[in-house]
Amino acid sequence: MTKKFVGLIILDGLGLTDQKENNAFHLAKTPYLDYLLKNFPNTTLKASGEEVGLPQGQMGNSEVGHLNLGAGRVVYQSLTQINKAIRDKTFFTNKQFLQAIEHVKKNNSKIHLLGLISDGGIHSHLDHFKALFDLLKENNLANNTFLHAFTDGRDTGTHSGINYIKNLLDYGFNIASVAGRYYALDRDNNWDRINLVYNMLTSKQAPVITLSLEKTMQNFYNQGITDEFITPFITDPNGLIDDNDAVIFVNFRPDRAMRLATALSNPCATNAFCSEGKTNFCGNKLVNNLFLVTMTQYNVQVKSVVAFEKKTLKNIYGEVIANLGMHQLRISETEKYPHVTFFFDGGKELQLKNADRILIPSPKVKTYDLKPEMSALEITNAAKTAIFSRKYDTLILNFANPDMVGHTGFLDATIKAVQTVDSCLKEVLNAIFAVKGKACIVADHGNAEKMKDNQGNPHTAHTTNLVPFIVTDKNVVLKPGSLCDVAPTMLDLLEIKKPQEMTGNSLIKKLV
């Protein structure tokens, strides 16, 4: 390790609010965070809306947060880009969408829209489904179009799926199948869940429901099953995916969509995100001559055409460190591993020089309220070993607990999650202090500080609240800012000049 070390500790989903009721952050016993806030320079950061490249008033999320944290500039998001394309009508002349239409017409086949039906704006948006349906109607394909609806219940209300389904039916959609995001959009290598949805879409291996969609959804609710956990079912057996069909995956955020997209487009791929090495879809029914469009680039294993390419970000934090010959470490558990790697690196799969990664498996539980400590202790132990090795100049670490447990809507479990992170944070920072290093502590967005909505129902979504930022250097004074200012601040602490591409500013107002 060189004479300077700076670690970035991301407390995922830990926002700030004056509202104390149903606030897991306030109700938790956090003696170490209390100590840090009392004894070290701290400020607040904006982590939502236009300050992170989202539409005004749009809640932040982990992808957006880590992009801005690592890029050191406001990164305009896919949601903003696609919304603009709809407004200026370029959406309706998009080359990739038109290729899918041509494929369907040439093969006299079907076109399928897959994705999270939600206006949460985190992974997808209802307006994008409607714009695509408008385009398909213009091309006389309304009767060939089938929607496979993945219900949300995390970034939106737990029982809001029924209203989104009504909305889409009223718009004219033919909904062929439904599945909760727990099954369709898993990102923790639970391939058995993805397999259920894959087989439903391609092999009709799921219950066929004859009741109305509204009654079917209400039956789930009556059984205590919320939108996230709706088990896959078919409403139109003739609307499933066959050879020569086209699929448009409407999710613009890749981390939860990439596994099902890989299964559909490249089922025998070897995947970095699959610990077993294979997707295990080789033995399933394969769909031949499938034309797949993804809204954005998911990953290299997904064989698709991409409707909206992202602007390449140059001289992000990780690249600056690598180009100087310095050593860096990224560490997280499975749920947030893409965030400290892919997203923190500007939405790219980078192989940076002298950059190591540690992936700690997330616990195999149905929901994280059953194990609110998740893998925080294992992350802590691995981080301490790495820090004491004195190999690294900088560390990027994510504690997922406040966000992932917050998404369950269970207040007591989320309080335990926050308390776990508090104790683990103390151990990590004590290790950093022992090697004469400094730490920046930040959250990427809010969540755990609001566990019930205004009607008293569980609140499982993110918030637009400010987030804390702490620097363990008593010789500085901080000013408020946004997430894009964190990377310049870290470079400032390392006494490295920020590159011109970083338009964020150091939050260090002056030395004391």
Swiss-Prot record:
Tell me a GO biological process for this protein: glucose catabolic process
Name the InterPro entries on file.
Answer: Alkaline_phosphatase_core_sf (IPR017850), BPG-indep_PGM_N (IPR011258), Metalloenzyme (IPR006124), PGAM_B_sf (IPR036646), Pgm_bpd_ind (IPR005995)
Q: In which pathway does it act?
A: Carbohydrate degradation; glycolysis; pyruvate from D-glyceraldehyde 3-phosphate: step 3/5
Binding annotation for Mn(2+) 1: D403, H407, H462
**Binding-site positions, Mn(2+) 2:** D12, S62, D444, H445
* Catalytic class of the enzyme: isomerase
- List ligand-binding residues for substrate: H123, R154, D155, R181, R187, R253, P254, D255, R256, K336
Required co-factor(s) are: Mn(2+)
Q: Please name the CDD domains in this protein's record.
A: iPGM
Q: What is its EC number?
A: 5.4.2.12
Q: Which GO terms describe its cellular component?
A: cytosol
> What is the top-level taxon of the source organism?
Bacteria
Q: Which UniProt keywords apply?
A: Glycolysis, Isomerase, Manganese, Metal-binding
Q: List the disulfide bonds.
A: none
List the catalysed reactions: (2R)-2-phosphoglycerate = (2R)-3-phosphoglycerate
Q: Which GO terms describe its molecular function?
A: manganese ion binding; phosphoglycerate mutase activity
Q: Which NCBIfam families match?
A: pgm_bpd_ind (TIGR01307)
Q: State the similarity comment.
A: Belongs to the BPG-independent phosphoglycerate mutase family.
Q: What is this protein called?
A: 2,3-bisphosphoglycerate-independent phosphoglycerate mutase
Q: Which organism is it from?
A: Aster yellows witches'-broom phytoplasma (strain AYWB)
The major lineage groups are: Bacteria, Bacillati, Mycoplasmatota, Mollicutes, Acholeplasmatales
